Amino acid sequence: MGRISGLVPSRFLTLLAHLVIVITLFWSRESNIQACLPLKFTPEEYEKQDNQLVAALCLTLGLFAVELAGFLSGVSMFNSTQSLLSIAAHCSASVALSFFIFERWECTTYWYIFAFCSAFPAVTETALFIAVFGLKKKPF
């Protein structure tokens, strides 16, 4: 039981770290958008890239809501497999998004980070929701 109780705060902290970096990216997305564009770009091209990045960030926040709902409701709080997956994904996302912001990576890179570090844990969280509430299985 000691390992599981150690996973709970670790998972919560990595979720919050990823969330803080995504919110920071909302504030400082201009440099990343400019990295996606050629040296001379039109306002329409800028707005298109901005809309794509904002859509990706909004999807990420929606998936955070799914994960936090499952975690805080207790559905997956003590599931060690989901906790380890979530810790690995969100820790990786925190590091990758830090590089994304500071190194001004292209916007298409965000979709890879999104798929592996936000969507995959949210899908497994949804599967746990279905198992617990639909199939009436124990969450751990």
From Swiss-Prot:
Gene: Tmem107
Transmembrane segment boundaries: 7-27, 53-73, 83-103, 113-133
Function field: Plays a role in cilia formation and embryonic patterning. Requires for normal Sonic hedgehog (Shh) signaling in the neural tube and acts in combination with GLI2 and GLI3 to pattern ventral and intermediate neuronal cell types. During ciliogenesis regulates the ciliary transition zone localization of some MKS complex proteins.
Organism: Rattus norvegicus
Domain of life of the organism encoding this protein: Eukaryota
Record-level GO cellular component terms: ciliary transition zone; membrane; MKS complex
This protein's record includes keyword Metal-binding: no
Chief location category: membrane
One Pfam family of this chain: TMEM107
Glycosylated sites: N79
Name the UniProt record assigns to this protein: Transmembrane protein 107
Subcellular localization: Membrane; Cell projection, Cilium
